[in-house]
Curated annotation (Swiss-Prot):
Residues 1-8 form a transit peptide. This is NADH-ubiquinone oxidoreductase 29.9 kDa subunit, mitochondrial. Keywords: Electron transport, Membrane, Mitochondrion, Mitochondrion inner membrane, Respiratory chain, Transit peptide, Transport. Belongs to the complex I NDUFA5 subunit family. The keyword Transit peptide applies. Complex I is composed of about 40 different subunits. InterPro entries: NDUFA5. One of its GO terms (cellular component) is respiratory chain complex I. GO terms for biological process: respiratory electron transport chain. The lineage of its organism: Eukaryota, Fungi, Dikarya, Ascomycota, Pezizomycotina. Accessory subunit of the mitochondrial membrane respiratory chain NADH dehydrogenase (Complex I), that is believed not to be involved in catalysis. Complex I functions in the transfer of electrons from NADH to the respiratory chain. The immediate electron acceptor for the enzyme is believed to be ubiquinone.
Length: 273
């Protein structure tokens, strides 16, 4: 389904230039798997970290040899595709990083969990955990405030903090609509919390510019060369491979067994002439 949509987007690119690019989060045709916002940088980060961690495994290990060969092959493919305007963006990002590095390493950035990581390849990766906005109409009201920003509000009954007289009046007004309109009730609590200083909008003064996206045609060509399904599936496989390397280095299966197998244990199963 998505491949057909890509072909259609490429064909109509002269009419709608924005159709040349895939919309992040849009359906891919696979349940639960949305379009990745920046698959190129994600794969570069995952592949380089995988290769770096594979160095902890002995060179004679067949797992290391096969994993390195596959990872290097796919990394070489990904590095060949560069989005339009990448060099100019890289220069802007470098200047922004030098000027606001302390802000970019904060736990919260633009309302999202984020961190700045330096990869083994020398690149700086800005990893952001995208949290979709929650629609309170889809949440069943159970009497508790479900907003994670409400660290000072435990339930709808008790409010911790200095409450001014006008704020007390506002709380009384909100309490009247608690059962009839829980959505407005919670939104009013949040607005009041921000005013009181108990709830802080976690937004950095720095506006980070994301990497220019690859075109739909570039992604389709990359998928064809890698040959492992959609690019989002390739990212998931790369994430699993990185986790597997961690498990292998912890288990150290290349070392001798703690309890050696008894001599002749497998003799019965040998194929004899």
């Amino acid at each position: 389904m998505r491949a057909a949509l890509r072909l259609l987007a490429t064909a109509t690119a002269t009419v709608r230039p924005s159709a040349r690019f895939l919309k992040p989060g849009s359906p891919t045709g696979l349940t639960g798997l949305g379009t990745h916002p920046s698959p190129r940088s994600a794969l570069l980060y995952l592949y380089n970290h995988t290769l770096d961690k594979l160095k902890q495994i002995p060179e004679h290990s067949l797992y290391r040899q096969s994993a390195e060969a596959l990872t290097k092959h796919r990394l070489a493919i990904v590095e060949q595709y560069v989005p339009d305007g990448y060099d100019a963006w890289q220069e802007r990002a470098r200047k922004l990083l030098e000027k606001h590095k302390s802000d970019l390493t904060a736990r919260q950035f633009d309302g999202q969990h984020a961190r700045l990581v330096e990869g083994p390849d020398g690149r700086a990766y800005f990893i952001r955990q995208m949290v979709p906005p929650q629609d309170w109409r889809d949440v069943e009201w159970d009497g508790a405030v479900l907003d994670p920003h409400f660290s000072w509000v435990q339930t709808g009954e008790d409010v911790v903090g200095a409450v001014k007289l006008e704020d007390s009046d506002k709380l009384l007004e909100l309490d009247k609509i608690r059962e009839s309109d829980p959505v407005a009730y919670r939104q009013g609590l949040r607005d009041l919390g921000i005013k009181m200083g108990g709830v802080v909008e976690d937004k950095s003064p720095v506006e980070w510019e994301s990497e220019p996206p690859l075109s739909a045609e570039q992604i389709a060509e990359m998928e064809a060369r890698i040959g492992s399904g959609l690019i989002e599936e390739v990212v998931q496989v790369a994430e699993g491979e990185l986790k597997l390397v961690d498990i292998m280095t912890q288990a150290r299966p290349w070392e001798a067994l703690e309890e050696e197998a008894p001599e002749g244990q497998w003799t019965y199963f040998e194929r004899k002439e």
